[in-house]
């Protein structure tokens, strides 16, 4: 499978939101949020992988990034369960709204309701 590396300003915004630009760890953390290549997070390395063949709008890409980054930030394990997915979605909504990405947050909310309505 051919992969394409995406660059998004969102991932560095997240590092800034977590640490603040003046924190020396920001420079160390930036590479951890590198988008290496549809959407899974390698929690041990801190990488988010997105299939380069999947066509995503900017808001969809932000949604996937926020969801997968949430898995990393919440320290979810490889063998995730429905509760992990639900908490990653909820955390992604918070991250996106906090950064002013309202359209992307709405995508997560819509997907969240669709995905989790049976459990709510």
Where are these regions (language model features)?
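Long, well-structured alpha-helical subdomains associated
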Residues: 99-120
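Active-site scaffold of zinc-dependent metalloenzymes
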Residues: 17-59, 69-76
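Solvent-exposed alpha-helix faces
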Residues: 93-94
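Zn2+-dependent metallopeptidase catalytic core
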Residues: 2-19
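Catalytic Zn2+-binding segment of zinc metalloproteases
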Residues: 54-55, 69-87, 97-100
């Amino acid at each position: 499978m051919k992969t394409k590396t995406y660059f998004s300003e969102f991932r560095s915004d997240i590092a800034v939101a977590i640490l603040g630009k003046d924190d020396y760890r920001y420079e160390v953390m930036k590479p951890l949020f590198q988008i290496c290549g549809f959407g899974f997070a390698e929690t041990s390395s801190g990488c988010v992988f997105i299939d380069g063949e999947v066509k995503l709008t900017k808001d969809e890409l932000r949604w996937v990034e926020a969801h997968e980054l949430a898995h990393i930030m919440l320290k979810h394990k490889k063998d995730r369960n429905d509760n992990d997915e639900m908490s990653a979605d909820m955390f992604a909504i918070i991250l996106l709204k906090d950064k002013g990405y309202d359209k992307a947050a709405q995508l997560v909310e819509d997907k969240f309701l669709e995905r989790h309505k049976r459990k709510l």
